[in-house]
């Protein structure tokens, strides 16, 4: 089979820079695609963390002027990843995370910063480097939404494009006045181009102009065509439904492997699940919880936000505690929720523990030590924490939305009778439904055999990138064949 060359363009990539699940996908998918005769090179911005983490950087192109300054394109590696890094200090070398400054506000020039990434991605697709010609350009989220626009309005032929929505809530909307600085013609500003409610919509541009659109679960692909989850783009997504598909994410099962995980206190596998008890004991101590081996310990690893349903969990905490359960929460986000969980830890000492922030090692320990993992999201394109939970034998308790609905088999009567259940789903996404899920989970936890079956089923579920990579490889080949 002929090897396809794919350029993946994303604003973050694990292990170099990560703020969310996009980085995990961008970092793990290339290796899985290699087994399907797809060679991926990834283009990402030259943030300080990226420049400090790459190996053997070589300048392959220079830009005398790129949105206000000079820039270099570097070819580099990170482990087994082939990379292009856009080294533009005036755009990317600054404190804070990739999108917001230390004050928590978006960088005012984000429109230019990510237009540069998209423009260089399009240029690479059109022969910027004589030795590199990708067959497909794969752009991720609003930060790369202008990439197909740069291709379309250049007047020159280019490769096919795939645009993946990781979260429709983040749309990259900017004022019309930015158009004159983007290097796009006035005719690009139209309903069939980049215009969105009188301004410029980067995400909308990607949805409008890419050859194929994917999102990260079949259920989310269906949900975003409706008004509730469509975030104002449902009409466009309905029009392009024949070019839209949902492909579930996987996780890196080498990084997330309880049998060899150096970040957890005790390693184990499906044959030695009882060893999780040692991780639970360590986790309880870490969060200041009572060392009760028989208490149902819920874990949460999440951004603290309305989308993630963490306000509902805060409201339901008295019922969770009243049922004798414990909570170990790791996350950061909305100040009000951060304060709420810190206050809950003070109010319920020994039963609620909260670490505000993010700690990768602690996230692994939660997966290895919690009995159940709570994901009460109001919407969830795919979700990765529940996939890790399945892998680690932490029974996922999830809202029946998006990728959560697609990846967790609810322990209903039919699934339990046929022995395929892997967790608990609840709907609608309300406090009352969440409280009922606590009761259902408590009853399952009390049944030692039923609970162990849930754990075994979860741990033997294939949550790797193998199947998703096969779907992406077929999508790429089908696209190339359309020429």
From Swiss-Prot:
Q: What protein name applies here? A: Glycogen synthase
Report the source organism.
Rhodopseudomonas palustris (strain TIE-1)
Q: What does this protein do?
A: Synthesizes alpha-1,4-glucan chains using ADP-glucose.
Xref: NCBIfam families: glgA, PRK00654.1-2, PRK14099.1
Q: Name one GO biological process term.
A: glycogen biosynthetic process
The superkingdom listed in its UniProt entry is Bacteria
Per the record, the similarity remark reads: Belongs to the glycosyltransferase 1 family. Bacterial/plant glycogen synthase subfamily.
Point out the gene that encodes the protein: glgA
Q: Name one GO cellular component term.
A: cytosol
């Amino acid at each position: 089979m002929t090897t396809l060359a794919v350029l993946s363009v994303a604003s973050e990539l694990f292990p170099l820079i990560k703020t969310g699940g996009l980085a995990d996908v961008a970092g793990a998918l290339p290796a899985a695609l290699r087994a399907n005769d797809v060679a991926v090179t990834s283009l990402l911005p030259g943030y300080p963390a990226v420049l400090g983490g790459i190996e053997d950087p070589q300048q392959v192109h220079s830009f005398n002027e790129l949105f206000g300054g000079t820039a270099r394109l570097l070819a580099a590696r990170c482990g087994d990843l082939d990379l292009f890094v856009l080294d533009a200090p005036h755009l990317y070398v600054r404190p804070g995370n990739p999108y917001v400054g230390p004050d928590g506000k978006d960088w005012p020039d984000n429109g230019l910063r990510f237009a540069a990434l998209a423009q260089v991605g399009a240029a690479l697709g059109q022969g910027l480097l004589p030795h590199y010609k990708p067959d497909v350009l794969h752009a991720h989220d609003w930060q790369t939404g202008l990439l197909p626009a740069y291709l379309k309005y250049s007047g020159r032929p280019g490769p096919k494009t795939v645009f993946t929505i990781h979260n429709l809530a983040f749309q990259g909307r900017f004022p019309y006045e930015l158009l004159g600085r983007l290097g796009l013609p006035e005719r690009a500003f139209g309903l069939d181009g980049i215009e969105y409610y009188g301004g410029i919509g980067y995400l909308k541009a990607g949805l409008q102009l890419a050859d194929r659109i994917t999102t990260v679960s079949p259920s989310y692909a269906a949900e975003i065509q409706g008004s509730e989850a469509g975030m104002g783009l449902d009409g466009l997504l309905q029009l392009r439904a024949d070019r839209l598909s949902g492909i579930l994410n996987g996780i890196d099962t080498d990084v997330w492997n309880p049998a060899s995980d150096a970040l957890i206190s005790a390693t184990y596998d499906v044959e030695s699940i009882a060893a999780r008890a040692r991780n639970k004991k360590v986790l309880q101590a870490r969060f200041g919880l009572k060392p009760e081996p028989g208490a149902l310990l819920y874990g949460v690893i999440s951004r603290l936000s309305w989308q993630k349903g963490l306000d509902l969990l805060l409201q339901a905490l008295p019922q969770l505690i009243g049922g004798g359960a414990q909570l170990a929460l790791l996350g950061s986000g909305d100040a009000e929720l951060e304060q709420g969980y810190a206050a809950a830890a003070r109010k319920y000492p020994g039963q609620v523990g909260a670490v505000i922030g993010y700690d990768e090692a602690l996230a692994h320990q939660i997966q290895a030590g919690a009995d159940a993992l709570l994901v009460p999201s109001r919407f969830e394109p795919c979700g990765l924490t529940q996939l890790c939970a399945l892998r680690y034998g932490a029974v996922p308790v999830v809202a029946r939305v998006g990728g959560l609905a697609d990846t967790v088999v609810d322990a209903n009567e039919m699934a339990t009778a046929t022995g395929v259940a892997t967790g608990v789903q609840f709907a609608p996404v309300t406090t009352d439904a969440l409280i009922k899920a606590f009761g259902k989970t408590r009853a399952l936890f009390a049944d030692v055999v039923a609970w162990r079956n849930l754990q075994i089923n979860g741990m033997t579920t294939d949550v790797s990138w193998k199947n998703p990579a096969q779907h992406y490889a077929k999508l790429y080949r089908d696209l190339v064949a359309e020429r």
